[in-house]
């Protein structure tokens, strides 16, 4: 996310990027040496960050303690750089979560914050999709998230001093207005290259299996369980191809076997990029079952291949998917969601003209999410606030 924003902003502006030293310095230095033309407007400044991996395993939120300390160092560096450069704009791009905004807003320059994420809660009715540990984790997160959105002092202070706030979901736009009293601009955190190749979804012949593609890390919040439970309810022939792998892979394989889906579901695991694209390009529909996410990059890969998307009507999917390119499932109850996945899959399997219409719509719709389109918005924001001290 961060690199895509920095590299595209640098096509239009001179950029001083303050970056974590340990994790990114070697990669960025090597890339700069190999592609000098791509970084000619970027000056990197690397700031070290203290890690405590053992403590983070015991108490994951401790990450923010060390991240906040890193932000103090980044701010001190920014103060010195500003004395030399006299920055026009300060833009806090990452991390996308709202909890730790850092201190760059204190520079007294127009402060652009975002795209912000992390506002989305996990629907309570979907905690049952998760294993016990996942259900406890996301249940606690829901409670803490509700408190932090309303009363988190760091976020509210940064929002108060922001010239402009970008955020990745429609729900976040509403909650920033409600809790922080600020208007935010909707901009999801991922995108497509403007010159991306458009590919067509293959035709589907009624009576043959509808090829479904699902991709994502096999972790609790991706909730493949929903789709697996939906497949036995389908009246039409289905064929599900599952990409990637992760901690939940074996559990999902066992569930698939228990549901009698051995001849329906194929778990491909990690495959070469070309093979993954072949699987996607030969599919008829793409399903997303995530119970918590901002916006997944795989959405735009699916659009690129002309795949209609079926997803839950929440997270970043609510704003990215519309009736021209996919189907959004309302979240009312666990059983209702499973039944809706099955119903919509059956519909697409028996209404090829509608599926083709959604396929064409997916290719057209993705043009709104290219990096060039995002830069038009960012450039307008920069132009509005440049040289206007706050």
Regions found by a protein language model. Give the residues of each.
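Donor nucleotide-sugar binding/catalytic pocket of nucleotide-sugar-dependent glycosyltransferases
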Residues: 44, 113, 144-200, 207
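Conserved donor-binding/catalytic core segment of Leloir-type glycosyltransferases
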Residues: 116, 203-222, 228-231, 241
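Nucleotide-activated donor-binding/catalytic signature segment of Leloir-type glycosyltransferases, i.e.
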Residues: 253-271
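Short alpha-helical donor nucleotide-sugar binding micro-motif in glycosyltransferases
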Residues: 270, 278-283
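Aromatic "clamp/platform" in nucleotide-sugar-dependent glycosyltransferases that forms part
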Residues: 291
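Short hydrophobic beta-strand element within catalytic cores of glycosyltransferases
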Residues: 308-311
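A short, well-ordered alpha-helix in the C-terminal region of glycosyltransferases
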Residues: 347, 354-368, 377-380, 384
């Amino acid at each position: 996310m961060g690199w895509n924003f920095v590299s595209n902003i640098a096509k239009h502006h001179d950029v001083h990027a303050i970056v974590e030293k340990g994790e990114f310095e070697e990669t960025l230095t090597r890339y700069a040496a190999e592609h000098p033309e791509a970084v000619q407007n970027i000056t990197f400044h690397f700031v070290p960050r203290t890690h405590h991996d053992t403590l983070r395993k015991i108490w994951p939120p401790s990450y923010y303690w060390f991240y906040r300390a890193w932000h103090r160092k980044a701010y001190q560096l920014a103060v010195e750089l500003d004395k030399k450069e006299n920055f026009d704009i300060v833009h806090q791009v990452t991390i996308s979560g709202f909890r730790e905004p850092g201190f760059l807003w204190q520079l007294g320059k127009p402060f652009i914050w975002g795209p912000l994420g992390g506002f989305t809660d996990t629907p309570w009715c979907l905690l049952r999709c998760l294993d016990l540990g996942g259900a406890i984790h996301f249940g606690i997160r829901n409670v803490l998230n509700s408190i932090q959105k309303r009363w988190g002092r760091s976020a509210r202070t940064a929002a108060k001093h922001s010239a402009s706030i970008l955020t990745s979901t429609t729900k976040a736009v509403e909650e920033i207005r409600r809790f922080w009293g600020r208007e935010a601009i909707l901009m999801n955190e991922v995108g497509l290259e403007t010159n991306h190749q458009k590919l067509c979804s293959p035709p589907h012949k009624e009576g043959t299996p509808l090829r479904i593609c699902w991709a994502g890390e096999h972790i609790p919040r991706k909730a493949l369980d929903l789709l697996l439970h939906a497949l036995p309810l389908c009246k039409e022939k289905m064929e599900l191809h599952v990409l990637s792998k992760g901690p939940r892979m074996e559990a999902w394989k066992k569930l698939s076997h228990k549901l009698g889906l051995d001849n329906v579901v194929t778990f491909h695991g990690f495959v070469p990029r070309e093979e993954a694209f072949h699987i996607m390009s030969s599919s008829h529909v793409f399903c997303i079952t995530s119970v918590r996410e901002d916006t997944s990059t795989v959405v735009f890969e699916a659009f690129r291949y002309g795949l209609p998307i079926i997803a839950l009507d929440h997270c970043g999917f609510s704003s990215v998917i519309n009736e021209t390119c996919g189907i959004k499932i309302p979240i009312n109850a666990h059983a209702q969601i499973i039944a809706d996945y099955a119903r919509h899959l059956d519909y697409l399997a028996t209404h090829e003209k509608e599926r083709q219409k959604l396929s064409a719509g997916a290719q057209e719709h993705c043009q709104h999410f290219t990096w060039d389109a995002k830069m038009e918005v960012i450039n307008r924001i920069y132009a509005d606030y440049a040289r206007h001290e706050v």
